[in-house]
Amino acid sequence: MERFLMQSSLSTSSLIYPHGSYDSSCNYCDAGEDKKGRICYGMVADQLTCEDYQLLIDQGWRRSGTFLYKPNNSDKKTCCPQYTIRLDTSSFKPSKDNKSTIKKFNNYILNNIIKEKDSSTTSTTKDIINTTQIKSNTKNNNNKTNDENIIKLNNDIIEIILNNEFINKFNEQDKKILKENLKIKINSNKMIKETGSYSLSFGIFNKYRSELNQHSITIDQIINFTILEFNKTINNSDYQFNLEKGQNNHINFKMINSSQILNDSTKTKTLNIQNNSNKNSTTTATTATTTTTTTNEPKHKFEISIHKPKCTDEVFSLYCKYQKIIHKEDDEKTKSGFKRFLVDSPLIPIIHPDESYDDYVYDGKDDDDDDDDKDEKEDDEDEDQEDDEDEDDGNNEDEKKITKENKEKEIKNHIYKIGKKSKTLKTRKFGEIKTPKPGYGSFHQYYRLDGKLVGVGVIDILPECLSSVYFFYDPDFNFLSLGKYSALNEIEWVQKVSQSIPQLKYYYMGYYIHSCQKMKYKANYQPSQLLCLETFKWVEFKKAISFLQPDKKYSRFYFDENENNNNEKLTYFEKEPELLERVKFRQKNFTFHFSDVSVRFQNLLKDQVIDYINHVGPELTKELIFYFK
């Protein structure tokens, strides 16, 4: 048995300490503080690999600072069951509300228009002239023979396809075959209304399915890449077509009318979210400052940038304003409480080599670090945070005590000393995968309007997803729906990154509570999925909620007639008693297994360890290290 765990190995291991089950009052219903309707299992993480946290959230866990918790939805005392919700961004279909949010935001940035209905009265002479010119051009184009235009369009699209990072590796003969088969065709009259005048089949890629599978590339991804690059690099008005993803591996070409052309020529480029998916470009714009740009000079400057998690005076002041006005919290906030909730993170960071490591990792200090004794003394009781993103907020006494035990020593200062810069992340599930910019780990996104900080998004970037932790904003800009806009921005980031890192395609929105009205907004990002907490299978949102009735708050979502139902009722430990010996323990400089513990201590420890095994599952039982302080 290996009794000593070397530091190099320890630096890539997850160290946790389970605290068991606890109950607390619920923030999502009117049950009252006396009713303990929220039942969870919790543990503290000193350090946690991004892959291990990905596995945890795929079993219903979430984090609040360094505290990890998993709601027990099946407990009869649970009043508001919480289900993990995620969106596959490759299939994202913007709703009417999503589109309205972007339009409203763009109107303000471009024209300083706050109400959409005012836009019709703000047209300038220049706008009218442009409209006239466009109508004239459209008429002339319609009188032309389209052959030359379509051939040029076809060539431009083939060039985009061949520039795909994966396709670019094809030999010249295969590229020639692609060129010969990727031909735009005229649709029949009965199909024009549904599919547009022209279409392009990508069926030729079925010939290369083995190569695609080998590199985890799908035909859908190639189509999405083509549409994205076309919209990004080619002026649609040159061709008068919109490209849309069709059925059976096709791209459809639909004519643009004059009002659409005018709208496209003046719209902001801040968000480029695609309907029906996006594996998107290989660029990662959010790692650098993203500025709104248009053909006309915008009335406002809008920027998004990613930073290390920090508690500056500017950030903390915005947080206090948000909590007071939006959540009606009049109690005084402290920096130390804010740090424990939204700055401290157990995730071991992997920073992209193109980024400055110091720019993105929290070093235990802050730019305005006068985090004086007053903060530490006053923070014996943590703040109540009622989170829009429904994260656990440290608002029950057990969690306050547990989290406070860990804030003093290792987490703030050592977690980033063991992180590193790397172009890749080695994972058990996918092997070696690329590192996105800025990296894997926990980050803050700053939203600035004319230089003023108006929003902060707290996010975790993991091997398969961007997980939204919390978002707070300046209530003075409530009219911009910044909460909704930030979600769309995060979805777009995932869409772009997934083009070069295919498995990183999900957007996690925390928990969904069907009985809670303020959770309904999460249903606006479709097609989303809910996690079945008995099988850990993802189920399409509408199908999942069909099992939830007013008199049935909790339900299993996934059913398989071929499965052994009796076996499902067994716990992980009952199925695999040998897992007890697979648990790795660590105390001081020693690592050991259950059989190495004295019989007396085994008797004291056994029930706690079995409970832990049943909550983290077989794979994490073997990976996490049960850490005794």
From Swiss-Prot:
The keyword Acyltransferase applies. Residues 282-295 have a biased composition (Low complexity). Its EC number is 2.3.2.8. GO terms for cellular component: cytoplasm; cytosol; nucleus; pseudopodium. It comes from the Eukaryota. GO terms for molecular function: arginyl-tRNA--protein transferase activity. Keywords: Acyltransferase, Transferase, Ubl conjugation pathway. Residues 356-396 have a biased composition (Acidic residues). Signal peptide: none annotated. It comes from Dictyostelium discoideum (Social amoeba). The keyword Transferase applies. This is Arginyl-tRNA--protein transferase 1. Involved in the post-translational conjugation of arginine to the N-terminal aspartate or glutamate of a protein. This arginylation is required for degradation of the protein via the ubiquitin pathway. Does not arginylate cysteine residues. Belongs to the R-transferase family. InterPro entries: Acyl_CoA_acyltransferase (IPR016181), Arg-tRNA-P_Trfase_1_euk (IPR017137), N-end_Aminoacyl_Trfase (IPR030700), N-end_Aminoacyl_Trfase_C (IPR007472), N-end_Aminoacyl_Trfase_N (IPR007471). It catalyses: an N-terminal L-alpha-aminoacyl-[protein] + L-arginyl-tRNA(Arg) = an N-terminal L-arginyl-L-aminoacyl-[protein] + tRNA(Arg) + H(+). Residues 274-298, 353-405 are annotated as: Disordered. GO terms for biological process: cell migration; cell-substrate adhesion; proteasomal protein catabolic process; protein modification process.
